[in-house]
Amino acid sequence: MITTAPRSEFAEQLTKKVEEIEMALENQQTGTVIKLCEEVIKVNAPTSEDLNEDAVKAKETATYRLANLYKEKGLVDELINLQKNILPLFVDFPKSKLAKVIRTLFDLTMKVEGRNAELVSLSHYIIAWCDKESRSFLRMRIETNLADLLYQLEKYQDALEILNKLTYELKKKEDKQLLVESQLVESKVYHALENLPKAKASLTAVKTVANSIYIVPLLQAQIDMMSGLIAADERDFTTAYSYFYETFEGYRSMNEHELAGHSFKFMLFSKIMDRHSEDALALINSAISLKYQNRHVEAMKEVALANKA
C-alpha cells in the first residue's frame, strides 16, 4: 500500500506505482492492475502541496488505465461506479484537470452500447455534482450528452426540455463549440418528431455558428449527415447525395467503418430516389464499396435493378 510521505516523496511513490501498473498491463495481470490503480486513485495527499503536477498526473494516468481496462473487459458497472467514486476523491484537483478526467471517462462510457438507461442515471449524478460544486461548463457538456442519450431513447420531450434551457445558456456564455453540438442534437430531435421546419431551423443555426469556428471532422460529418437527411425529406435528392457523400468521405477518412457504411447506404438511396439507378449500381460495383457490402446494400441493389428494369 502507499504510505503517507512528505511532499515530493508522495509524488514519487505514485509515479513508481504507475510504472508498476504499466508493467502489469504488459503482463496482462488484470487483478494486479486493478489493485494498483485503486491504490493510486484512493490515496489522499498529506497536504495540498503534495498534490503537485506529478502527483496529479499519476492519479490521472491510473484512472485512465483502470477505466480502459473496465471498458475492454466489459465491466460497465465498475466503469460507471469509477466515475462516481472519483468525484469526491479528486475534488482538490485543479478544476480544468478534473473536468478533463470526468469528460474523458464519460466519453469512454458513452461508447458502451445497450446501457443508455444507466448512462442517463450517471449523467444526472454528475450534473447534480456539478451544480453543487458550481462547475457550470462541465455541467453543460454533460447536459448536451444527456440530451443526445434521451434522443436515442426516443424521450424527445425530455431532451427538448434540457436543450431549450441549455442553448439559451450557451448563447449567453458564447460557448460556440458546445452550442453547435447542442443545436445539432436539437435538430435531430425535431427531425425524429417529423417537425421539419424546426429541424431545419436548428440546423441552420448550427451552420451559422460552425462557420465562425473550427469544427472537428467527426462533428462535421454529423452535420453533413443531418443536412442530407433534411434535403432528402424535402425531396432534393441531388443535394442530399452530395451531403451523404461528404459524410461518407469524412467517416472513411477517420476509419469509422460502421458510420461510413451507414452513410453509403444513404448515398445509394439518394441516387435511386433521384432516378439514377445506374449510378447506384455503379457505386455498388465499385472498388470503394467492397468494405461496405451488407444486407442493406444488397437490398438497395435489388431496388436499383428493379427500377432499372
Language model features with spans:
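Extended alpha-helical scaffold regions
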Residues: 1-309
